[in-house]
């Protein structure tokens, strides 16, 4: 029995992602084998994992058992009686290797202050009486007299030193002390959002890797870096993390985070006040520009023109530009073609909705940050029912915590169902397999009936596999249930389709884009 389980575990570890294996297979243990009845009993640490493994992996484990013993084996799943004595199984997504980063705003500010002090001792400060250049004076005037134009002033000695490169030189570092706080005020960065507290999974691992590469080599690796994806998937978190990491590494860097709507507003005000020269000087002098939700530039020709000039100047000076949007660059309507071509000249990366294991990790980490020990059962229950984005998960967790506190009850699955009653009702009627089949059939111009047929031409089989993949990702149906809805196919056929499309999605940009469009369409 134990020999079989070692063999089975080794095969499943090769077939599954590390996250899936650690979450679902590693916590299991064989507890009994009845040779006369040909039954194998496998224990799971909790009810949720028992149900999930039974629906998703029982067929594969039974196949491996049959091959091992050369006989049909009935696989039974039971609750581990020692489950309460065990520590919770790992559900968090392992973070990609990286040097330790500061955690939380206080630690980040403290680390930057320490870097500032070190830089000040190593680099002579600029004289206090250096006169302010016209550029800095204009920015200072706009910042103080016209506060609603969002151009933070730069320290006088930075402006006097001229445009810096990424390597700090004489006069580049601002004064120590409270300057770390003022740098956050000027950059508009949120010190809470760091790489250290960004939960990584399959859905965002490429985006995180690209972000780290850009933070380590700004203006060199990928310029621009364009991140796109739906609301609440972590785009803003990642670009703030890049800015925060750069401030830690190069405290004198000129960094600016701005939402596209604020940029549009500033262009309008600069136009009204005839302050475009000052506006240009400020943005063209940055080392890192982070612009969020650029789809808000749609139809705003003057804003697009000014941003084009800023983009060209920054890239020419080897400054880094990072952009986010809710959709693929070429899908943004009302944006000038020359801007689209600039967006495509760097690296474009999609951030997808988090997979189940990643959603669990997000919930448990967020609960931990709130000082709450959230049980794995509850985290899995919430993650299984709420699939769209991180903000939705965090909002659900806040409701659960508030409901628990108000009623003076411990957090359990029953309490969670009560707290999220309205939200779960909405979720349960959102996406059906039938809707997925119709949407995919329309997208690829085939008949819905082809989803159930036995036809195997590539122009039919491929969309059918895509529909199976989306059914697995976007609904709570088990593999056998999905197979039944696709013309009574075996669950192994569905599993093959899901794995095939998931693997190709990570390698094929066009397929990834098509899936992103389909997912956005289905989610409305």
From Swiss-Prot:
Q: Where in the cell is it found?
A: Cytoplasm
What cellular component terms from Gene Ontology apply here?
cytoplasm; plasma membrane
Question: Binding residues for ATP, per the UniProt record?
Answer: 232, 234-236
Q: Where is this region: Domain III, AAA+ region?
A: 188-404
List the residue ranges of the region (Domain I, interacts with DnaA modulators): 1-72
Record-level GO BP terms: DNA replication initiation; regulation of DNA replication
Residues of the region (Domain II) are 72-187
Q: Which UniProt keywords apply?
A: ATP-binding, Cytoplasm, DNA replication, DNA-binding, Lipid-binding, Nucleotide-binding
Protein task? Plays an essential role in the initiation and regulation of chromosomal replication. ATP-DnaA binds to the origin of replication (oriC) to initiate formation of the DNA replication initiation complex once per cell cycle. Binds the DnaA box (a 9 base pair repeat at the origin) and separates the double-stranded (ds)DNA. Forms a right-handed helical filament on oriC DNA; dsDNA binds to the exterior of the filament while single-stranded (ss)DNA is stabiized in the filament's interior.
Subunit and partners: Oligomerizes as a right-handed, spiral filament on DNA at oriC.
Protein name per its UniProtKB record: Chromosomal replication initiator protein DnaA
What gene codes for this chain?
Answer: dnaA
